[in-house]
Amino acid sequence: MILQAQTTDAKTCIKLLRLAMEDAAFYLAGTSDDRLCNEILSKFFTSEVNRISYKNVYVYKENSAVVGAMCVYFGGDLDILDTEILANAKALNSNLVLANECEEDEFYIDSIAVDEKFRGKGIASKLISHAFVIAKEKNHKKVSLIVDETKPKTLAFYESLGFKNIGKKEIYKHRYHHLIKEII
C-alpha cells in the first residue's frame, strides 16, 4: 500500500532514502558525521517545507511496516524547498551550494529506495507509477530523475518504465544520466 509519509516515519524513511542519496546525504546535511547527518536529515524530514519533507515523501507499506520510500517534488519549487536546508548549512558555517538536479518544469523523483529484504517484488515500480499519478493530478507534463553513470542496470530499469535518457548532468562531482518520462 502506498501512502503519504508521516513524521513518525522519519527514522525508517531517512534510512531508506540515504540508500539512494549515497554521499549526497552528507552534502545535504552539511556534515560528514554519520550520526549528525541522520539527525539533520530527520529534522528536515519532519519539517513542512524542504526537499525531503515528509510532505514530499511517499511510502510503501507491507504489514504496516515501511519497506520502500520515494521523495518527489516539482523543480519549480526548489527555491522555496531549499531555504531551510541552506539556513542549516549557514548555521554549520558551511558554504553549501545546492545543485539543481532537475529543471523547473519537471516533477522530480529525488530519491527512491526499497528495503533490501523486499527487493524484486515490484515495489519500486509501484512507487514510480504513483509518481506518474501524482504528476498528472498536479498537471505536470513530465517526470524526471537522474541515474549514476556507473549503474547501467538501474538505467535499464528506468528505461523499461518508459524514461528516456536526454543527456548528462554533473552533480556533486558525480556524473549522471538525466531521464525524462512524458506524462500524457
Where are the regions a protein language model picked out?
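Conserved beta-strand in the GNAT
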Residues: 59, 65-74, 108, 113
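A short beta-loop-alpha structural element at the N-terminal edge
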Residues: 1-15, 23-28
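A short helix-loop-beta-strand connector motif used in the catalytic cores of GNAT acetyltransferases and
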Residues: 46-59, 76-80, 108
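Conserved GNAT-fold acetyl-CoA-binding loop/helix
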Residues: 22-45, 56, 90-91
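Conserved GNAT acetyl-CoA-binding A-motif
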Residues: 106-107, 119, 128, 135-148
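Conserved acyl-donor/pantetheine-binding loop and adjacent beta-alpha core of acyl/acetyltransferases
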Residues: 74-107, 111
